[in-house]
Design a protein with these regions (language model features):
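A conserved amphipathic terminal alpha-helix motif
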Residues: 13, 133-177
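Catalytic beta-strand-to-alpha-helix segment of the class III nucleotidyl cyclase homology domain
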Residues: 501-622
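N-terminal accessory interaction module
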Residues: 307-412
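Regulatory cytosolic signal-relay segments
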Residues: 388-445
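Catalytic NTP-binding/metal-coordinating core of nucleotidyl cyclase/transferase enzymes
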Residues: 434, 438-518
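Cys/His-rich short segments
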Residues: 244-315
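Beta-strand/loop substructures that line and gate deep hydrophobic ligand-binding cavities in soluble
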Residues: 101-154
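Hydrophobic ligand-binding cavity/cleft-lining segments
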Residues: 13-65
Length: 634
């Protein structure tokens, strides 16, 4: 991908007062690390700008109707000058090159273009080339521009060498930054309390260390799964500990609204009640509906009484912010750009600013070249096939410059979505007042709903009496709640003798159902009058809506209706669920079940019948009480 406005040597610009030459500075260095290893660090432009420029920036949305590829106007200081500029979206090809063009509105420059190219070398290393082009407003400013350009490029070279040493020799990170002091007394208190609550010791140490000595940039948006992933810890345990930490005044919980395309946060609120049914991403120029499992993410920040952190922005557009985007480029109005297809065979998405999309199937047997045309809010064709590293030419037939990007669809996200968080028992216990706006049901694209029902309760109440029966029913709720929590789900509510629970993944829901049957069999052995009861379970997965009902988070929709109907198809000791889900189970999971029957049932409002399996535990459990009675009789 070429660098915008790039050329060889110097370029001339005619001004009303003088002839001004642009200043071009380049530097090439050799690195021992491979381009793919250097890329995630060298493209962290927020941190590199922090080190090289040293002054933060203020980002404001560009004026509506501006015929520009830029989405923001930036105000900052550099080299002793105040300046503002329109920042075009960064352009890049993964692991190969990136660049950015800034059209200056004020300050000593007309324009600023910066780019980095990473080329693999025969020894497995990288040839890194840095190129900076500065266009002064007046010829007298050219020497200053040259001086500043040399300084910036030299500093970037040193940062790249530090990155290389960090990767190759485990040298300190080049991004070590000064930190504000933490309140050690509050930290020690919170650590002791977290230990008392039985939370994972490694997770507790990681949280305390991060709050004590982590840079502000890492603390203004603490993402539990990302923190855990980087330290080899369990993500749910990290999330669980941070929820506990909120109750101890160690951190505060925030909800970030995340764009479904660039996946960056464009707004942040402190309560679920502040979330509406729609948000807008300025960068992607995209309005989108709020879905709890895609567009709302839980993040944390140290409580101000523990540590004061500042949210300074030095750059918001570098490739590091959107690792799922493999190519991004600006296509001027009425022109075309040729993009390189990804090297890995998979399905990708072509996205154009404003929301037009097309699918890209990268496969060895696909054509070498393909074309796409952008008209209004549509990309045609909607289905594109390309071989790895093939050429895709995109034509912009609109009246304004737009950026396009190729996105990985299967990129694993490290977001602790609101759907994940609200299914956790800790959230329901500690944050029962953090509810959605009553008039705003929010969609969840995929959720597995489990219903259980206690059987034999009529005989139980008759024989044991109301008090003993009520106690047994309540105790069985505790048993199921513990198992559901351990399996990654959350109890939504109890209704009479029944439990309703929600899970993120359908297979996890099946595993929880199996574990519930095992746990209940032990409960029948241990509990007085337990032998009078049984349990049956049904589950179903699909889209649903999350609402606030009876001052609690609840679920409704056809998926919930289907799950309830499926549970009614079960007999005592059975788990009933979809046939397709049964076939997706691993051999290990299937071995835990015995298939009783394949059945079909209809649900009102669902066009086709549900194809279900009735299953039992693979090994029938004989209660200890039955064994004792058999021994006594003999």
């Amino acid at each position: 991908m070429g660098t915008r406005g790039s050329g060889h040597g110097e370029r001339e610009y005619s001004g009303t007062l003088s002839l001004v030459r642009s200043v071009v500075v380049t530097k090439t260095i050799q690195l021992a690390s491979a381009p793919a290893d250097v890329w995630p660090l060298i493209t962290d432009t927020d941190r590199t700008n922090r080190l090289v420029i040293g002054t933060s920036s203020v980002y404001k949305p560009i004026e509506p109707g501006a015929k520009s590829s830029a989405r923001f106007v930036v105000e900052t200081r550099a080299g002793g000058f105040s300046m503002s500029y329109e920042e075009a979206p960064f352009e890049w090809t993964l692991n190969k090159s990136f660049s950015v063009y800034r059209k200056m509105r004020s300050g000593p420059l007309r324009a600023y273009t910066y780019g980095v190219t990473l080329a693999p070398t025969s020894d497995g290393g990288t040839r890194a080339t840095f190129r900076l082009e500065l266009e002064p407003r007046h010829w007298a400013l050219a020497p200053i521009a040259k001086l500043q350009g040399n300084r910036i490029v030299a500093n970037m070279g040193r940062i790249a060498e530090s990155i290389d040493a960090h990767l190759r020799d485990s040298a300190p990170s080049p991004f070590i930054e000064p930190t504000t002091p933490a309140n050690e007394e509050r930290l020690d208190f919170a650590k002791r309390e977290l230990v008392k609550r039985g939370l994972d010791g490694g997770v507790i140490d990681a949280i305390v260390t991060m709050i004590r000595s982590g840079p502000d940039a890492d603390l203004v948006r603490m993402r539990p799964f990302e923190i855990a992933h980087g330290r080899g810890l369990d993500g749910r345990e990290m999330l669980r500990a941070l929820l506990h930490a909120v109750t101890l005044g160690l951190v505060e919980l925030r909800w970030a609204l995340v764009c479904p395309s660039c996946r960056t946060a464009n707004d942040q609120v402190s309560s679920l009640a502040e979330i509406g049914d729609e948000s807008h991403c300025q960068l992607c120029d995209l309005s989108y509906g709020i879905e709890l499992d895609r567009a709302v993410e839980a993040t944390f920040v140290p409580h101000p009484s523990v540590r004061q952190v500042t949210n300074q922005m030095f750059c918001i557009g570098g490739p590091w912010r959107t690792p799922h985007v493999v190519v991004q480029a600006i296509v001027e109005d009425g022109s075309s750009r040729t993009l390189e297809a990804p090297s890995e065979q998979a399905r990708y998405r072509l996205f154009a600013r404003g929301g037009a999309v097309a699918s890209i199937d990268v496969a060895d047997d696909a054509p070498e070249e393909a074309n796409a045309r952008l008209t209004g809010t549509e990309l045609t064709p909607r289905e594109i096939r390309l071989r790895p590293c093939g050429k895709l030419t995109v034509t912009n037939a609109t009246a304004e410059p737009l950026h396009v990007k190729i996105e990985r669809l299967g990129y694993a996200t490290l977001a602790a979505t609101a759907h994940v968080v609200t299914t956790m028992s800790e959230f329901r216990r500690f944050f029962s007042k953090d509810l959605l706006k009553p008039s705003t049901p929010l969609k969840v694209a995929s959720c597995a709903i489990l219903f259980s029902d206690l059987t034999g309760s009529t005989a139980l109440y008759t024989k044991a009496g109301d008090a003993a029966a009520f106690r047994l029913v309540d105790d069985h709720f505790d048993v199921l709640r513990k198992v559901i929590d351990e399996q990654g789900g959350g109890v939504v509510k109890t209704m009479g003798d029944a439990v309703m629970a929600a899970f993120i993944e359908p297979i996890a829901c099946v595993r929880a159902a199996i574990a519930c049957l095992h746990a209940f069999e032990q409960f029948r052995i241990d509990a007085e009058n337990g032998e009078l009861t049984g349990i049956k379970i049904g589950l179903y997965a699909g889209p649903c809506y999350v609402i606030t009902a009876n001052e609690a988070i609840d679920y409704f929709g056809q998926t919930v209706n289907c799950a309830s109907r499926v549970q009614h198809c079960a007999d005592t000791g059975e788990i009933v669920f979809e046939e397709d889900l049964f076939e997706r189970l691993s051999a290990e999971d299937k071995a835990k079940l015995r298939l009783v029957e394949r059945v079909e049932t209809r649900v009102k409002g669902v066009e086709h019948p549900l194809r279900l399996v009735r299953t039992k535990l693979a090994t029938d459990v004989i209660s200890a009480r039955s064994l004792e009675r058999s021994r006594a009789a003999s």
